[in-house]
Structure formats: structure tokens, C-alpha cells
Amino acid sequence: MLADEQPKGSPARGRSAVRSGAFTGLSYVTLSLAAAVAGAFLAHKFGRNRETDGFMAAYGVYLVLVLGAQAFRMVVVPDLTRAEAEGRLGSEFRAYALAFVAVAVPASVIAWVFSDFLGELITGRLPEDSAHVAAQALPWLVPAAFAQLIAALAASALAAKDSYVPAALGFALGGIGGVVFFVLFADSHGLVALAWGLTLNGAIAIGLPMVVLLVRGNRLRRHRGVPLRLRYRLWRLLYGAAVPLALQGLYVIALRFAAGTGEGNVTSLSYAYLLAATFVSATAFSLALISAAPLTRRGVDAEGAAEHVVHSAWISLAFVGAAAGLVALVGGRVVTAVLGDAFSGNVGDELGRLVVYLSPWMVANAAFLITYPLMFVMHRTRLLIPLALAGMIVDIPISIVCRSLWGLTGVTLALGVTTLLVVLGLMAALAPRMLFVTAVGLGRLSLLVGAATALAFGGASLVLSAVPAAAAGLALYAVLLVAMRQFGLAQAWQYVRALH
């Protein structure tokens, strides 16, 4: 389907699509900033010791469950959109919610009753102090993580009604409320205050979208035609999260290989990855969320899917290029100011370079976030688990070769290569003819954005110091994008505006 054949939509609805994407993206940025503030405060307040090791071990459990919640938003929106069209959205929402509560309640009770045992289990050979802190945090972090899953479900139900702002506000206010709580109570209660703050975060994230759902008349009574099907719904969550969890596993593998390249490189790669992930998710993840419902209603074929991926990636990577250029020039200074002198000098500069080396991963991850919901819109889910397993397996030899050739730089490149292979597999699973069209389109726009970023920020850095070069580079980058708009950016913007 050609771009000029797409339904253009009214100007008001075009503004609605842009507003929805902007609010969703700003919500994700707010959450990321809140997490950064919490991390910086934790580092300055508590340092790096046995207690923080124990808390971070428990926090890893929370992260895995929250990642599943984020993936579930991409999975369930098509289901709820079809339910809305058939007049059974409230019933479908209730069935999913009951299924998740049926797991959340016993899991939370187990985390509370057996907290000491679980604290020792997840901290392994760490000292007893670490296990004690983990045991304090787990009874709060487990229900907090399930709260994020229910919040994702409520946000998806609103998305089925083309309503994105309430959920975006709920997630953003939850992130802010959680970090404020942590800062206020850290002195008197220690690290467990962060676990309490995350629980408050989840409560706020659930509360606002739930109130909006109820006010808009979605009764949560059970519909006779909507069975609970607990195992089916939990299985849908598990296989829907398989590929996102596998891609997170690639990052864990990258950290393991980075550990063999020198002291401190794991930390540097971690921060570079978090920055790169924030840039991509704030744009590509937001576009994926606001497009799933309209694409489900409209229907999409292989050509339409390819067009959707390329156009959405154009918008995402245009912003990512600017962010990456800024980090390359001034990221080290910002990190030093936030995290302290341990990241000053060459360490900070290296972090900026790592973000640049993660450019292939950013392109691949943007394509993944945009493509993945299409698997559920088009009912092409049979190969998700095999693709997830294959990605984990092939990443190890790729990482071995790349690290032996280029060290830490090779580790970042291997992460991008394997992620790209998984994305290409997803595209082939959607439709073989989509693979070629999308690969060509993504390759073309990657070259355009990469050239504009290198010319603008690299050129400015040759004649100016870091901060003035960043400002001048950003201005020149914007000019170059305007000059290149006829190479696809203008059509991509028009496409996104017509989504709603």
C-alpha cells in the first residue's frame, strides 16, 4: 500500500495521534528520568556495598516482571481492540485482570511468608547482610511488579478506545511519586524505602486509568461469552514476553562478555545501554503502542506492515539521531555531574562513544518495538519461542568473535547484530516478502540519519568545544532533516498523523 493511498484522517484526528504519541513518549521519558534520579540518589546516599548488592538482587526480580508487563501491552491491545468492536471490552478486561490477580496474590503471599529463604536464594554467596536487605525488599517488590502488569492491562483497555493520555499520566505520576517517596523516607528507613516507593508507583499507575475506565462506563461484570480461561491468558502472557525477554537476555550476555574486557567496562556498558534504550523506547515504543489498535481495526497486509515499520522507524530514528549526537559530545560531562568523579575524564568520554557504537542496536531495537505488535495484529505468533531461543544461541559465538576482534566495541556491535537477526526473523515470520521491502527501507533511512548525525555533530565538534558543538550540531541536524524530508520523513510524518 502506497503512502499516498493511506487514509489521511481529519486534521483533528491527526493532531490526536501526534498528541497521543507525544504524551506516551513523555511518560516513558519521565519514568526513565525518575529511575535515573532514584539510581543517582541511591549511589550517593548508600554507595556500593553489601546492602546495595542485596537490594539490586531483589530489584532484578522486579525488573523481569516489569519487562513482561511492558511486552504484554504490545500483545494484548489487538485482543482488547477486537473485544471493544464486539461490545465486550469490559468483560475481556475483567477476565484478564482476574487471571493475573489469581497469580499475583499467591506469588505475593509466598514472597512475604518465605522472604528470608528467597532473600538467601537470590543473593547466593553474598554475605548475610545482602540476604537480609533482599528479604526486606521482596515482599514489596513482587506485588509492585504485578501492579505494573495490571496497570499495563488497564492502559491497553484504554488504548482499545483510542485513549492514551490517562495511562501516560498514570505511569508518569507513579514514577514521580515513587522517587519522591524514596528520597523523603530513605534517611529513616533505608533501602527498603525504594521498594515502598515502587509499590506506590504501581498503585498510582493502576489508579488513574482504572478511574477513567469506570467513569467512561466500562462495567467489569463478566460477560457470558467471555470465559476466564486462566491457563490460556497466562500462556499468552508468557509466549508474548518470550522475545522481549530473550532480547533482554542478549544484554545480560553482553555484560558477561564486557566483564572480560577490563574493570569498569560492565558499568560503562550498562549506562550506555540504558541511555540508548531510553532514546529508542521513548519514540519507537510509543509509536508501537498508539498504532496497535488502529491497525487492528483497519487490518494490515504484508505491504502495509512493511510501510508501517519503515515510516514509524523514520520518526523514531530521527529523534534517536539527535539524542545520540548530543550524548556523544556532552554525555560524559552529564554522567560525571550525576554519578560523580568515578565517571570523569576518559571514562565519561568512553561512555559517549559506546552510545554511538550501539547505533546498530538502536536501529534494530526500534525495528523490533515497531514490528512486534504486528505479530499479534496479523496472528503470526507460532515462531515466537523458537526465534527467542535461536537468538540467545547464536549470540554467543557472535559475541565471542566480535570481542576477540574489537574488545568492548565488539561486544556492543555483537548485541546489535544479534538483535537485528532476531528482528529479521520476526519480519520473515510475518511475511517473507515483507522482509526484503523493510530491510531495504530501514537500511536506507539508517544511512540517511547516520550521515546527518555524523555531519552535524561530528562537523561541529571539529571547530567548537563540546557544549557549543552540541548546540550547533543540534541546529544543523534539524536543518539537514528538513532538507531531507522528501526522502521519506515527510511521508512518515503524514502516515503517523493518519494513524487515528
Regions found by a protein language model. Give the residues of each.
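Interhelical loop/hinge segments that connect adjacent transmembrane helices in multipass membrane
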Residues: 2-17, 192, 210-247, 264, ...
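Membrane-proximal transmembrane or re-entrant/amphipathic helices at the cytosolic face
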Residues: 2-5, 461-500
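Transmembrane helical elements of multi-pass membrane transporters/channels
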Residues: 19-43, 201, 205, 209-213, ...
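Interfacial/gating helices of multi-pass transporter permease domains
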Residues: 42-63, 132-135, 258-278, 347-352
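Helix-loop junctions and terminal segments of transmembrane helices
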Residues: 70-85, 283-303, 372
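Interfacial segments at transmembrane-helix termini and the short loops linking adjacent helices
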Residues: 117-139, 330-363
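Membrane-interface junctions at transmembrane-helix termini in multi-pass inner-membrane proteins
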Residues: 147-169, 360-387
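Hydrophobic alpha-helical transmembrane segments
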Residues: 170-184, 188-216, 390-395, 408-430
